[in-house]
Each structure stands twice: as structure tokens, then as C-alpha cells.
Amino acid sequence: MMKNKIKIALCQMDIDPDFNKNVSNAIDMINKAAQKGAKIVMLPEIFISPYDVRRFKKIAINDKDPLIKTFSELSLKKKMMIVAGSVVERSGRNLYNTSFIFEKGRLIGKYRKTHLFDVDIKGKITFQESSVFKPGNIAKTFNTSFGKIGVVICFDLRFPEMVRSLAKQGAKMIFAPAAFSHITGPLHWELIVRARAMDSQSFVFACSPALNKKYSYQAWGHSAIVDPYGVVVNMLGFKSGILCEEINLNLVEKVRKEIPIL
């Protein structure tokens, strides 16, 4: 029987240049989230590396990588669903920004980022994900023991129709591993995560890396849990940490009945 009250944990990681250290840190934070009673845990976008397109080809994995087995086994051992942020996935000659989802000891699905982060804010930030990644092309839900969920990645959040389509497919929870920059974060981060929760009438969970001023690309942090009214349940600051809150999915039905916009 599906439970309506669920404890969710977002792991705002300090990202290290070393792949293995990041994996170890992710596992440690997942274990700590389990100790807090979390049943679903999420990692940030590209949690295995600093966000730098020059590094991505070197750290790419496929769905046969030992990392997949590690998280599959961890989901079974800790009795949790793991939304494993995103990694660089290699498929043939192509690279994708991909989120893998694990539950009950197995990989239950993956989502490839659809809208790639190609921006040029003069004098502030220029970034072109499409120089490395191919876009995904399917916005779909995943069936879990907690009901249907939707997954989007970072820049996807700027497209309300995509998030609304997941809600229309039955998702009550939207998971968004992300890494808004220190330029776009203060402008739009809270505004966007609240807006997507409001216009999809879903819980939105947005998980970022912690701020690290040593890197050329500096993530904004501020991982957040937002309810279907668009109200921030809780939000972290710049530093690493685990945001853990219990949510009640009954609120989704309540909001959708009160204000029927879907």
C-alpha cells in the first residue's frame, strides 16, 4: 500500500575533483539520510565532478558501470528510493546528462536531460552543454512504490509545460537534480522552483551541489523542498548538508481539487 507521508532527503554535496571521493561522499550522505528516516533520497546534478564540460568525457559511465550496482545494492540495503542526481552517461558515441533512479535493489529507470544549458550572459557567464551532451527527448514518469514521480534536470525547470506534462501523467512529486550558477541562482532559483510547484500542483524537490568558490562554475546551493501551493517547506544555504523533511501527498489532491488547473 502506498504511503502518503514520506520523509525526503536532499543531499547538498561538496563536490571534489576526484570521481571516487564524490561517490564515497554520496554514499556517506545517503547513509546519514537513512539514519534520519528518509525513504527517498536525491543527489545533485553531476555529483561525480565539478561542473566543467572539459572534464565530462573523462568521467562518463554507462549503465553497466559498477556505480549502477553500488546504488542498486544501497537502495535495497537501506530500503530507500535513490534519485542519483545526474552523471555523464555514455551511450555509443554520445554523451548525456542522465539521472538514474533506483529502488528495491534495481535500476528502475533513467532520464536524460532534455533542455541543455546553453547561455551567454555577457560579462558574467557563458556555458554550452551542447558542446558535449546530446539532449534527451522524452518527458516521462516512473512508477515507484511511492506512486508516479517525474524527474527533470536543472535547465528543464525553465520550461513549465514540461513539468506540467509530468503532473498530467500522474506525478505528484517532481525531482530536480540541478546546479544553477552563482549568476542565475540569485536571479531565478527560488522563483523557478516555487513556480514549477505551483503550476504543476506537485511537490518539487530541487537538489544542488554546495557553493565552491574554487571552481570556474560555482553552483548556487539552496537545495529546496516546495509544496504544491508553491510554498517553500525548507531550503538550505550555500554550505553542504542534508535537507530532510516529511511531506504528505494528500496535500497534492487537496490543492488540485481547490484550484483545478491541470
What are these language model-derived features?
Residues 63-83, 148, 157-243:
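CN hydrolase (nitrilase-like) catalytic-core segments centered on the catalytic cysteine
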Residues 8, 101-108, 226-234:
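Short, glycine-anchored, charge-dense loop/turn motifs used at functional sites
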Residues 84-86, 98-101, 140-142, 223-225, ...:
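Short beta-strand scaffold segments in enzyme catalytic cores
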Residues 1-40, 175:
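N-terminal active-site segment of His-dependent metallophosphoesterases
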Residues 19, 27-104, 110, 119, ...:
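Cys-nucleophile CN-hydrolase/nitrilase-fold catalytic domain and related Cys-dependent amidase chemistry
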Residues 90-169, 182-191, 257-261:
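Active-site catalytic loop in hydrolytic enzyme cores
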Residues 11, 59, 111, 142, ...:
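Hydrophobic residues at beta-strand termini and immediately following loops
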Residues 13, 87, 113-114, 154, ...:
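Active-site beta-loop-alpha junctions enriched in small/polar residues
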